[in-house]
Amino acid sequence: MAESALTPLRLAQLRRFAARFALSEPEALSWELLHRALIHPSWSAQEGGEDNDRLEFLGDEILRLLAAEFLYRADPELTVGEMTAVRSVLVSDVALAELAEGYDLGEFLVVGRSASGDERGRITRLADGFEAVIGALYLSTGDLGLIRPWLLPHLAHLAESVMADPTRGNHKSALQELTQKLAAGELPEYRLVDPGPPFRYEVWALGRLWGSGEGPSKKLAQQRAARGAYAALRSAFDTALQ
């Protein structure tokens, strides 16, 4: 769809959205590609036409490349394993959805009826849309010039936070390692106490409750519960772990 085929209202919406990124060369942006990046598959399933699936695939690969390059240059002492762990957080649905919310992407995302009331899928929709926008920016110029200036500061800020976290953002894995250090074979038990959404989980280990967490998805609720439980266990057994 060329720019002339976009309705004046939609084009105005796209211009407002693009302005949030303070692009270095806004005139190079393809409005047709940006429009497509903001069409969720639920809309194309309902109304026909193109959606952002392919752009999301491209954007996912670009994000992984940029995150890997950033970590490679940021700290020469990071091992491959450490870089992999940090990158997995940088490009996670939760991290990307938070970035998308910062740019109000949901306001411009076109979704079908089947998805409009699906709160459970909101994080994935936002993350996929964000990746699709990355893909659209790349295809607009054929390079990373429209992406690096605004994305790298986000990666730097998040990477700093993740690397300062001993769990590297994977609280469930860190909690499991911790419980096994304290008692061989001991695994945390996640108990669903509110079927939601939002979902709420409690984490039990060593015969007692250590934390709880709430989130729009079961995965996120468990991670939040594990984060609190990890901190509580570390505090309670600090001497034993030294």
From Swiss-Prot:
Keywords: Cytoplasm, Endonuclease, Hydrolase, Magnesium, Metal-binding, mRNA processing, Nuclease, RNA-binding, rRNA processing, rRNA-binding, tRNA processing. InterPro entries: dsRBD_dom, RNase_III, RNase_III_dom, RNase_III_sf. One of its GO terms (molecular function) is rRNA binding. Disulfide bonds: none annotated. Its cofactor is Mg(2+). It is found in: Cytoplasm. PROSITE patterns: DS_RBD, RNASE_3_2. Its EC number is 3.1.26.3. Residues 170-235 form the DRBM domain. One of its GO terms (cellular component) is cytosol. Residues 14-142 form the RNase III domain. Mg(2+) binds at E56, D128, E131. GO terms for biological process: mRNA processing; regulation of gene expression; RNA processing; rRNA processing; tRNA processing. It catalyses: Endonucleolytic cleavage to 5'-phosphomonoester. It comes from the Bacteria. The active site is at D60, E131. Homodimer. Digests double-stranded RNA. Involved in the processing of primary rRNA transcript to yield the immediate precursors to the large and small rRNAs (23S and 16S). Processes some mRNAs, and tRNAs when they are encoded in the rRNA operon. Processes pre-crRNA and tracrRNA of type II CRISPR loci if present in the organism. Belongs to the ribonuclease III family. This is Ribonuclease 3. It comes from Gloeobacter violaceus (strain ATCC 29082 / PCC 7421). The gene is rnc.
